[in-house]
């Protein structure tokens, strides 16, 4: 393999390292209190999301190590190449499982947030209503960014699968391998872009929510 490839996939460990929502306590029953309660439930629903991100980062690091090990070998070590590629394929499968769990967490959060939007519609205080709408706008953009990022990550995992299947092929050409690596690189570059957008909207949402809570008289716990 040393003669077959000079580059490696541009896998960025922590590409999914997004920022967590800020949690506070919850209260009451009027529209503002109901909004507050629903927002906190949405944040609580994302705890598994944060846990899965950590697991995915660990798996990404292990996959990088496997890739590096394969690239140090040549075709005289074909059996080792196959064994390492199989381990990498198992790693990709695990990442698919954890990515699904992460996505499930975000879907639950989004469901809770829809309830928050309903509560916001009944707020009569103009200043609080404007701040609630601003927070909702950033949160909706955040969910959209995550959805795009999730789809691209799934695509990247499929491309990784194909890469490791190719590495087990004795007849693999340099051109075919380079083309697949380019596809993996391009996919991970998109993930980084979407991750940045997601993190930006998370920061804006957290700030908008702080403003909302300040206006409504809630204490915001920073973490």
UniProtKB/Swiss-Prot annotation:
Write out the GO cellular component annotations. plasma membrane
Native source organism of the sequence: Bacillus subtilis (strain 168)
The entry's keywords = Cell membrane, Lipoprotein, Membrane, Palmitate, Signal
Membrane topology, as annotated: Lipid-anchor
Q: What is this protein called?
A: Uncharacterized lipoprotein YkyA
Q: Where is the signal peptide?
A: 1-25
Q: Which PROSITE patterns match?
A: PROKAR_LIPOPROTEIN
Q: Which domain of life is it from?
A: Bacteria
């Amino acid at each position: 393999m040393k003669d077959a490839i000079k580059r490696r996939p541009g896998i960025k460990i922590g590409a999914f390292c997004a920022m967590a929502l800020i949690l506070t306590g919850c209260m009451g029953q009027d529209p503002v209190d109901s909004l507050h309660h629903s927002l906190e439930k949405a944040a609580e629903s994302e705890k598994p999301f944060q846990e899965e991100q950590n697991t995915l980062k660990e798996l990404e690091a292990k996959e990088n190590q496997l890739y590096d090990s394969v690239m140090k070998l040549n075709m005289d070590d074909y059996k080792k190449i196959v064994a390492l590629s199989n381990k990498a394929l198992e790693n990709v499968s695990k990442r698919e499982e954890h990515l699904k769990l992460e996505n499930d967490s975000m879907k639950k959060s989004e469901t809770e947030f829809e309830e928050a939007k309903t509560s916001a519609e009944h707020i009569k205080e103009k200043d609080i209503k404007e701040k609630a709408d601003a927070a909702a706008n950033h949160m909706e953009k955040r969910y959209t960014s995550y959805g795009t990022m999730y789809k691209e990550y799934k695509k990247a995992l499929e491309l990784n699968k194909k890469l490791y299947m190719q590495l087990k092929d004795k007849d693999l050409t340099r051109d075919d391998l380079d083309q697949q690596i380019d596809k993996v690189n391009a996919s991970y570059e998109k993930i980084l872009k979407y991750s940045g957008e997601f993190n930006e909207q998370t920061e804006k949402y957290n700030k908008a929510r702080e403003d909302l809570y300040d206006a409504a008289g809630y204490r915001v716990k920073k973490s």
